[in-house]
Amino acid sequence: MQTLTIIRPDDMHLHLRDGDALKAVAPYTARQMGRAVIMPNLKPPVVSVADALAYKARIMAALPEGSAFEPLMTLYLTDQATPALVREAKAAGIVAFKLYPAGATTNSDSGVTDLFKLIPVLEEMAKQGILFLVHGEVTDPEIDIFDREAAFIGRVMKPVLAQVPNLKVVFEHITTAEAARLVLEAGDNVAATVTPQHLLLNRNDLLVGGVRPHHFCLPVLKRETHRQALVAAVTGEKAHKFFLGTDSAPHAKSAKENACGCAGMFSAMTAIELYAEVFEKAGALDKLEAFASKNGARFYGIPENTDTITLVKQSQTVPASIPYGDGELVPMRAGGEIGWTVQY
């Protein structure tokens, strides 16, 4: 039977929620990943160092006994952010600030309205070596939802990189050929995370044969040509600029199967197996370890994990749902098969 042993991976873009939801989902990430970069879009958002440290304590309390998993904490960037906050965050071990353009995604109401007014804050991030994590979509109502990432590149990303050229930027959960091209052409201070859904699915999987609410995420799934461009990027010559970030974003089944359903896919349960499928299909299984376990750590300036995990070429059936607080949660590929299984 084919096996693949790799350095334990890290999830560089994860939503863990809070309360009972946190307790339901954290163990799934902790059994696969050594570390994860924790997104700060709670209600209310994680905007202060005290918020982040309190949230980290709640995450640690939700982990299985004996778990070595480490959450890497971030702050939610707001219009009120200051260079002093950046310095305080750095001193407290916060790894990054996350940009949510106001209204772009779940719990982004407190997001930034004009990033260019925060240039002094971004300059301080560059000085302190704190990363800038970007949800790269414009929110103007006149811009088509399928074009919002591409529009963001010209309107925001390129001008910001020109003004703060040494800022370390992660273009999060990229979904388009344009975003991949930007990262490929930018300096080594610019990298990107890529989700399993954007490597495996296209917008037909969302809309053909009926609306599939469990395939609805933001940024929304794009054309097949974009999916192919992402696969080419993560397996190509400059693959070191791309790394694993699931954007696993749990919502109760009742909130997804809804007249106005929530955006987000829960992939943490079988994340590394889904990525293995991508790399296997691309004939690039030998590049999975760098994507999952090396590139992100290097970009963040942290050591690689010292232990390993082993994947077996053995099919598994993903559960139709799992308990989630008072309700249930539908994982990615629910009820379907994945050709790889992690040996726990």
UniProtKB/Swiss-Prot annotation:
GO terms for molecular function: dihydroorotase activity; zinc ion binding. Zn(2+) 2 binds at residues 98, 135, 173. The active site is at 247. Keywords: Hydrolase, Metal-binding, Pyrimidine biosynthesis, Zinc. CDD domains: DHOase. Its EC number is 3.5.2.3. Zn(2+) 1 binds at residues 13, 15, 98, 247. Pfam families: Amidohydro_1. Binds 2 Zn(2+) ions per subunit. One of its GO terms (cellular component) is cytoplasm. Pathway: Pyrimidine metabolism; UMP biosynthesis via de novo pathway; (S)-dihydroorotate from bicarbonate: step 3/3. It catalyses: (S)-dihydroorotate + H2O = N-carbamoyl-L-aspartate + H(+). Substrate binds at residues 15-17, 41, 135, 218, 251, 263. The keyword Membrane does not apply. This is Dihydroorotase. Belongs to the metallo-dependent hydrolases superfamily. DHOase family. Class II DHOase subfamily. Catalyzes the reversible cyclization of carbamoyl aspartate to dihydroorotate. The keyword Ribosomal protein does not apply. It is an enzyme of class 3 (hydrolase).
